[in-house]
Amino acid sequence: MIWIFGDSFASSGQDLSWTSIIGDTQNFASNGSSEYRILKNYLLQRPNIKENDLVLFVHTSQSRIFLKDDRELSSRMLSSHTNCDIIFNDVFEKKEKQYIEILELIWDDEFFNDIFDLIVDKLLGVPNSHHLTFFESPRTEIVNLNHIWLANQGEINHMNETGNRLVAEIINQLMH
């Protein structure tokens, strides 16, 4: 069994999605997930993961931060994004006034990058796991697939069929 935790780059279960191509999966990725939400989803499922199971983490952007589930956000109005967390750029583009002022007051790149790194460090310790990202990242322990996304943008996990197939091939290489 392959367990998947991550953001929208892993959330689709369509036939052409890399998450379907790679085999028998339990997919707990969700659109707009912060790294904290990815950690929490993993911790909830950890008791169900068997010793020989594979765990895939699709790490998100350092600038996506957790938002409690009972808070309103325009992105959460979409049925596909009910647990969407805040990403700095979206808040400003969508004019989320209730968050703009707070973020302008508290935002500190160093702090949010440090918290992100602490969570990633914890997840890197998960046995039998592989780590991917589609965002630019200085982390060398994480397989960076940003170039695949940029060259193959589309509707399934933000990629076209070719992009999803390429990601599946890379994951299959990691597993063997």
Predicted regions and their residues:
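Alpha-helical cap/lid subdomain in secreted, periplasmic
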Residues: L44-H176
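Serine-esterase "nucleophile elbow" of acetyl-processing enzymes
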Residues: M1-N41, P47-N48, N160
